[in-house]
A protein has these predicted regions:
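Short amphipathic, charge-patterned alpha-helical segments
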Residues: 203-205, 354-370
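C-terminal accessory/binding modules appended to enzymatic or scaffolding proteins
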Residues: 334-346, 352-354, 358, 516-560, ...
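Gly-rich Lys/Arg/Thr-decorated short loops/hinges at beta-loop-alpha junctions or inter-strand turns
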Residues: 110, 115-125, 175-189, 292-298, ...
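Iron-sulfur cluster-binding cysteine motifs and their immediate structural context
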Residues: 47-51, 444-450, 538-557, 568-581
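Hydrophobic alpha-helical positions that pack around
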Residues: 228-354, 366
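Ferredoxin-type iron-sulfur electron-transfer modules in oxidoreductases and energy-metabolism complexes
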Residues: 1, 16-36, 53-78, 126-143, ...
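Flexible inter-domain linker/hinge segments
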Residues: 84-145, 305-320
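Conserved phosphate/anionic-ligand binding catalytic regions in large, soluble enzymes, centered on
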Residues: 7-12, 144-165, 264-276, 435-447, ...
Length: 581
């Protein structure tokens, strides 16, 4: 048997490395082998251990602890019931069962550090097919047939960008992978690089062949050390096997590849800002035109796509563009990967065909909302996206339908919110992020987001004024019309969508000085119900501000002047005696 421990960043953070070490100490007692894999996407169940027998998955064990190693060894030694208590439930199996995986097809299956495991799953066969039987024009046509659009957020046709770079005059051309995944709560690209780096390399090589580039660069944020480490090893192995470098596969095509670690600036997700950073300059967007296809890296013709876009390419070449186009909707083909996070039961990586609804993802795959709470909204597209309310849960997931709601597909962030989430505070959070991440080049983004944030800060503190909502809307449209790049133009989206769908919450904050979600501390008042209080003194002992007084077995009181509204009393009271209004 083969024991496989999931060691993506999520698994390691949950303790997978310790689980691996515990099993390693005992594995000698069996005839089994022990290896690692990347993230299969079920982050809510990490650490995960899979047990294979003859290539067939026999057991998937979840939330495994180091002390469970003895159970695992007992199972592989013949005790069929040894791991029953840590085996995945039938309900949680639905998380993967209801997905369609193309970009993530190898994630959590192969060892990302061993190239032979990738080639065993048809790895580099697409590259071989391209070099042996297809011209660059053939490749671009196949991508056109597939309908593959850029998965970084803009949804621009991939074939069009490749063709523009192909047609540009110049001896030197560059292919660049944008792995600068900066959206809060997004981890799709990180998982692909950590779990299936050779798929990224193969997709990039096919793209380089198509546009005529002899050098490829992966721009990845420095905050992804494991992804960088595994990608470096994958590049080294690909070079040793003749899949990368000079005269690839003996077919006369040469392309070298290197990694550039970025400093983590959100604006460097914008392609021209990324290029500036690659050149050693401050990451600030360039004016377009010219576009990178005409004048990009070092002012040479360049093509930029993100990780997920490249991760689809080898599958399309092997299976045909028509097979990819058969999935999805008329305007949005294929599958899309989402990072499902927030107040959700089953959070992790989800890949579904375009055309599924938000309800399909959040409730059928994600299992619905934690702790019996009600679904309130979902934030799509990160800081550049928008909030979609519960009555639009049946919105189809494609570029046009999501755009009609005021949100965007984005790179794939999907943050789920329940009834305890304040939408004004949510807008404040995302605007605070974009204001800090603004490169400062244009006034609309640099100053406009700051003024908007000042208004939101006042509102959540109970200092909102009549006319603030209208002023926010005016600033939003001014920034959208005047900002230079996509970051600035989309920065107002979280504010606009929360005003559109949750205007009543803004009005409650401004007019009534109340937070309907009971989330904004400055608008809350803590009191103790004398009839329910048992005088156990636990709340008084836990209060960091010494704001609670009272005798043992007598009703306690909260001093409003001292109360810092931290919520400690609510969390420790076993009798529901603390009221929050």
């Amino acid at each position: 048997m083969k024991i496989v421990v999931g060691e993506g960043s999520c698994g390691i953070a949950a303790g997978a490395a310790k689980v691996y070490s515990a099993i390693e100490k005992l594995i000698g007692l069996t005839g089994s082998t022990l290896t690692v894999t990347g993230c299969i996407g079920m982050c809510f169940l990490e650490p995960i251990v899979d047990i294979y027998d003859g290539g067939e998955l026999k057991k998937r064990l979840v939330k495994v602890r180091p002390e469970d190693a003895e159970k695992i060894i007992a199972y592989v030694n013949g005790d069929e019931n040894a791991v029953n208590d840590i085996e995945i439930s039938d309900e949680d199996k639905l998380f993967l069962k209801k997905q369609t995986r193309i970009a993530l097809r190898h994630c959590g299956i192969i060892n990302p550090e061993i190239i032979d495991e990738y080639t065993a799953f048809d790895g580099y066969r697409a590259l071989e097919k391209v070099l042996k039987t297809m011209t660059p024009e053939d490749v671009i046509e196949e991508i056109k047939i597939s309908g593959l659009a850029g998965r970084g957020g803009a949804g621009f046709p991939t074939w069009f960008k490749w063709n523009a770079a192909r047609q540009s005059q110049g001896e030197t051309k560059y292919l660049i992978c944008n792995a600068d995944e900066g959206d809060p709560g997004a981890f799709m690209d990180r998982a692909v690089i950590e779990s299936d780096p050779h798929n990224l390399i193969e997709g990039m090589l096919i793209g380089a062949y198509a546009i005529g580039a002899k050098e490829a660069v992966v721009y990845v944020r420095a905050e992804y050390p494991l992804a960088i480490e595994r990608l470096k090893e994958a590049i080294k192995q690909a070079e040793e096997k003749g899949f990368l470098g000079e005269n690839i596969m003996g077919m006369g095509f040469s392309c070298k590849m290197r990694i550039k670690a970025g400093a983590g600036a959100f604006v460097c997700g914008e392609e021209t800002a990324l290029i500036e950073s690659l050149q050693g300059e401050r990451g600030m967007p360039r004016l377009k035109p010219p576009f990178p296809a005409q004048s990009g890296y070092w002012y040479k013709p360049s093509n930029i796509n993100n990780v997920e876009t490249f991760a689809n390419v080898s599958w399309i070449i092997l299976n045909g563009g028509e097979a990819f186009a058969a999935m999805g909707t008329d305007g949005s083909k294929g599958t899309k990967v989402f990072a499902l996070t927030g107040k959700i039961k089953r959070g992790g990586l989800v890949e579904i065909p375009m055309g599924k609804t938000l309800r399909d993802v959040i409730f059928d795959i994600g299992g619905g909302i934690k702790n019996g709470k009600k679904f309130k909204a979902v934030q799509m597209g990160g800081p550049s996206g928008g909030c979609i309310p519960a009555d639009l849960l049946d919105t189809v997931i494609d570029y046009k339908a999501l755009g009609a709601t005021g949100a965007i597909m984005g790179s794939g962030g999907m943050v789920v919110m329940d009834e305890t989430t304040c939408m004004v505070s949510m807008a404040q959070f995302f605007l605070d992020f974009t204001a800090k991440e603004s490169c400062g080049k244009c006034i609309h983004c640099r100053i406009g987001t700051k003024r908007m944030l000042e208004i939101l800060n006042r509102i959540v503190k109970g200092e909102g004024r009549e006319g603030d909502i209208e002023l926010l809307e005016e600033l939003c449209y001014s920034i959208k019309d005047g900002a230079l790049c996509g970051l600035g133009q989309t920065a107002p989206n979280p504010v606009l969508t929360t005003i559109k769908y949750f205007r009543n919450e803004y009005e409650a904050h401004i007019n009534d000085k109340k937070c309907p979600a009971k989330s904004c501390p400055d608008l809350l008042e803590y009191t103790i119900d004398a009839d329910k209080c048992r005088g156990c003194t636990l709340c008084a002992k836990k209060c960091p501000a010494n704001a609670i007084s009272g005798e043992v077995k007598s009703a306690h009181k909260i001093d409003r002047d001292k109360c810092i509204k931290c919520g400690s009393c609510v969390s420790v009271c076993r009798f529901g005696a603390v009221n929050v209004d």
